[in-house]
Amino acid sequence: MGARASILSGGKLDDWEKIRLRPGGKKQYRIKHLVWASRELDRFALNPGLLESAKGCQQILVQLQPALQTGTEEIKSLYNTVATLYCVHQRIEIKDTKEALDKIEEIQNKNKQQTQKAETDKKDNSQVSQNYPIVQNLQGQPVHQALSPRTLNAWVKVIEEKAFSPEVIPMFSALSEGATPQDLNTMLNTIGGHQAAMQMLKDTINEEAAEWDRVHPVHAGPVAPGQVREPRGSDIAGTTSNLQEQIGWMTGNPPIPVGEIYKRWIILGLNKIVRMYSPVSILDIRQGPKEPFRDYVDRFFKALRAEQATQDVKNWMTDTLLVQNANPDCKTILKALGSGATLEEMMTACQGVGGPGHKARVLAEAMSQVTNTNIMMQRGNFRDHKRIVKCFNCGKQGHIAKNCRAPRKKGCWKCGKEGHQMKDCTERQANFFREDLAFQQREAREFSPEQTRANSPTSREPRVRRGDPLPETGAEGQGTVSSNFPQITLWQRPLVTIRIGGQLREALLDTGADDTVLEEIDLPGKWKPKMIGGIGGFIKVRQYNEVPIEIEGKKAIGTVLIGPTPVNIIGRNMLTQLGCTLNFPISPIETVPVKLKPGMDGPKIKQWPLTEEKIKALTQICAELEEEGKISRIGPENPYNTPVFAIKKKDSTKWRKLVDFRELNKRTQDFWEVQLGIPHPAGLKKKKSVTVLDVGDAYFSVPLYEDFRKYTAFTIPSINNETPGIRYQYNVLPQGWKGSPAIFQCSMTKILKPFRERNPEIVIYQYMDDLYVGSDLEIEQHRRKIKELREHLLKWGFYTPDKKHQKEPPFLWMGYELHPDKWTVQPIQLPEKEDWTVNDIQKLVGKLNWASQIYPGIKIKELCKLIRGAKALTDIVPLTREAELELAENKEILKEPVHGVYYDPARELIAEVQKQGLDQWTYQIYQEPFKNLKTGKYAKRRSAHTNDVKQLSQVVQKIALEAIVIWGKTPKFRLPIQKETWETWWTDYWQATWIPEWEFVNTPPLVKLWYQLEKEPIMGAETFYVDGASNRETKVGKAGYVTDKGRQKVITLTDTTNQKTELQAIYLALQDSGIEVNIVTDSQYALGIIQAQPDKSESELVNQIIEELIKKEKVYLSWVPAHKGIGGNEQVDKLVSSGIRKVLFLDGIDKAQEEHEKYHSNWRAMASDFNLPPVVAKEIVASCDKCQLKGEAMHGQVDCSPGIWQLDCTHLEGKVILVAVHVASGYIEAEVIPAETGQEAAFFILKLAGGWPVKAIHTDNGSNFTSGAVKAACWWADIKQEFGIPYNPQSQGVVESMNKELKKIIGQVREQAEHLKTAVQMAVFIHNFKRKGGIGGYSAGERIIDIIATDIQTKELQKQITKIQNFRVYYRDSRDPIWKGPAKLLWKGEGAVVIQDNSEIKVVPRRKAKIIRDYGKQMAGDDCVAGRQDED
């Protein structure tokens, strides 16, 4: 504010503060008006600094004047303020704003006359304002001055903020003052993203251009020399004219103002767009009943600006419609002001009118004039009742005891007795806030199971007993309730009709009220006065004793109170006589809320016809279920339906009801499966006493969510449609509905929780309705606990039938047979069949799988092969010889029953694995030899090319996972593989697999590696450069090799692929070489297969290669990038490419060019992604005009630890971009932030830490990075913050160079994006994933992932592994900035790494080393030595 106050100084400020805002008004100008004016100018993209001089004020006035006619009130106020300020600067004496405007008008008229005079004298020396696009140079020639970015930015901002509201038109008019058609088109292009609006504008311009051409026909004949041609419509729109022509027309004699004409056309188009975006007519703008007048005026003028009418019409609208459409409150006031009132007077008069506050004031005024009017809120019960306030203390009316001025009366104000106060009075009253219970004489009754299960799961309702006038209070308090009581549900208020004194009345059954209170009714007999306390205070009543009342055909006699009660109440004094009880039947389990999937409705599927016997069976079943409250009848108002049918139970004449809930299941929300698998007996601890229970009708014991029940509706049809079908819906969890298992499990867990907490010594395994209960208690104690558990379940409505209560072993549980000290699967009988169908085989495989968990050695691979492919279930499948053999072996294994033992937590687990051949493995898990806890098999082949070691590692992982699930720990393994073999393979593949502790066991057949690849080239052996190529269209290919000794060979192949030809070339080299050979390939595919050392494969060609490899003594295989200019590789490339390869990379050129136009990828990325020769890729980059700005990056010594990021703010287009760089990889995260504050930086750091492992950040000393918010964020996320040191090369080098790089990429893609924030994210994507180079030839995105993954692996696996030579280290010496390497990694510590470079062992600080996996690029030549961090 201080800055703006300096616009005026000293005496001028005093003059400013004497000027009045309005003639005769009280308010005067203040400093705040200057501050406001400068902010408004800033908003309209005008320089606020112009306010400091008279000349500047004049320039502002010239700019604002054209917008006054159509502008907002703010523009007019701004114009008035600047006009007044101009007068103060010029020392022109004025008293108020009006005088200032008159003076300005006078000056402008004088200037106009002078200008006209000067024009006639041809002495026009006046300076044109710099804001106009056409200015005169020193020679007096008109020159175009392009629109400033500030003006364009202001225009874009207007459209972004206002969309196409009416304000846009005056803003456009002001910003485009004097512009040429080219400038106007520039303005339209900046908002080209609004395509619909631009299309409408284009149509209007085309129409106007056509109209111009019609009215101004072109003159016949050529244009005379020196004469300017006449503009056509398309010339005015700037499409067929150039800038010089436009300037010529605008400054010619006579001038043709093409800019103004085009501007007029655009404004016509903008008017149409505004009408579309603001479709409300001025006639529809009416003030709401509670809408403040100010808001109504805002809406009115906004709509008025959008109206396409002349200013006179708009003035008429303001005068008439504004008052006419106001609400009645405001209209009254506005009419009173008269017709000549200004808008300001109207707004002042209507301030505060029309809102709730105004209504309250009017009401208060009205209320103050009404004396003693009672407003009663209740029904008609209080018709003649006038409540007079009376003091308890002095007895006078008009005040209450709390406000009484008389001396305090002794004793109780209610009963008059001394010794207590009224609040402690024990005199009888209807005490709504009582603490005594309803039935003190007996405890809450417990239900018998039968009764519990007979009631509806939803009802929580009072029941009135017929018969005895008093409740039974037998010794056990167990009395059975007959089912013919009236039931009153509590979904609505329990209102009943009662007969009292020969009259019928409606009354509320209130178990919370002590007394029965009725409203005015005439009763015979004597009464005595009484006062009772209620919710609304104290009321006076008449007490009648021994009054007979009849409710629901039952009679009771008791005390009744008559008085002004809001509702008739039957209290407990009557209810207890009637034998009314509150019942809580079935399980009081909370229902789990369930919904349909969003946007879906319930099922509406018609019932299909059923046979007579099925209809009878279903009718009977549903009648029983209805009686038990499990289903309820519903009417035709429920539109949903699910089909129902019936099937006969196994080995029984009884029927089972089945509802086809498939459609409802599709529409029901998804549930999280509470239990992810079934418990396994091998995980059970050995227990002294065991019981197995089963919950009867498990699902039917749990209520279904009330609002969901309607969707379970079904219909029992009648025979021959004799009558409408009977409609039901479920009240409990239905069988076959997808939510039932999860909700049941969840409810059961909640119910068992208190029992488990009370009895920690008891183990309960719960799976659906099967319960295994084990303990180390004596059998009698154990059985007492079981009884307690069953009672606990019964209390919640879960019935455990005796029929399924297993007390003695063997226990049948979950398909297992449990004995006290061992377990097995329930007996398995394999069928004997002549013909096997697909379905039979599926069942057989299922049984064998089930048996394999305890019977070792079971195989099913050959049986599974029989049912591969799409076959019908009933198709007959002939058994192959192998399958018959496998089945016979399995039958033999199953002849002898095998048992498993139980788990002893004190002993360790051991897992032993055997290889069965044909990719099948078997294993046993035990704690004592020959006493298996469980067994299993493994027969998966996860990849096409594999070897036994790889498969063994997969077996071990499967067992480890299984053990963690069952026992919560991993076993110690005994594996049939020698330590040396394992170590050899593990050295190469330790990254891919984790193996727990293990030992060698000599169980043939042993696992071994059949051949081994060398790590270094074999000295003296011939080197074969191999390559293959294939044409995609003709499928013709070539494979061949060239050796370092000059040998070469090429063969032609048909019906092949690139990958096959590469493998074929390796096979040729192996065939034609000696017992030792070096092979160099450019195929990552071939390298990947062979480096994994497979000993079997689904590919015949790979099997042939394996056979050749086994014959060799030594083989070295290496990879080089394709077409790298490496001698032999380039030769063989030419050899196999003749007539083949040409096609391959040519079809990549177009795609690469297309990608480069989008992402400006560097040549390495294109060569790699599109298989292009470097020459072609470099040519694409060279021909791109945006990629020729590259400079060299400077390199200091930077900390390259994996967790270090550098942060910095950079500026572009007047906006702030916060950039974070991962130092080790060059990966970037960047974002446009609203302001350079600590809050924004802290939020960015937290977001960064949420996505990547950030250990330390390095920033400059800017106030945003040194702020408390950033420190707090770093403290919370455990990030170390370091600050840059000025003049230190290690300071902020990486992020500074990345800022430059990012800005360069933004420049390349800027025109593809409308907003800077979009361009920034596009540039980040391009830098991270579309630019390759530097270490490993990766992109920054690939490099960061590799570095982080490598860091994790080296940290975690170092504990178990010592041979980590497979990683390569690139490092820098203290003085030399060039990266050296690759060196071997010997050890990785916290602060340093030990490496071996050639024969020298060095210790390098961790921050000066980068560790990455070696992918066999040792022979790639100089090109593979790590370059700089960015691209070459």
UniProtKB/Swiss-Prot annotation:
Q: What Gene Ontology molecular function terms does this protein carry? A: aspartic-type endopeptidase activity; DNA binding; DNA-directed DNA polymerase activity; exoribonuclease H activity; lipid binding; RNA stem-loop binding; RNA-directed DNA polymerase activity; RNA-DNA hybrid ribonuclease activity
Instruction: Tell whether Protein biosynthesis is among the UniProt keywords.
Output: no
Instruction: Give the start-end ranges of region Interaction with host AP3D1.
Output: 12-19
Q: Which residues form the RNase H type-1 domain?
A: 1018-1141
- Residue numbers marked as site, Cis/trans isomerization of proline peptide bond: G221, P222
Q: RT 'primer grip': where is this region? A: 811-819
Xref: Pfam families:
Gag_p17 (PF00540), Gag_p24_C (PF19317), IN_DBD_C (PF00552), Integrase_Zn (PF02022), RNase_H (PF00075), rve (PF00665), RVP (PF00077), RVT_1 (PF00078)
What's the protein name? Gag-Pol polyprotein
Q: What is the lineage of its organism?
A: Viruses, Riboviria, Pararnavirae, Artverviricota, Revtraviricetes
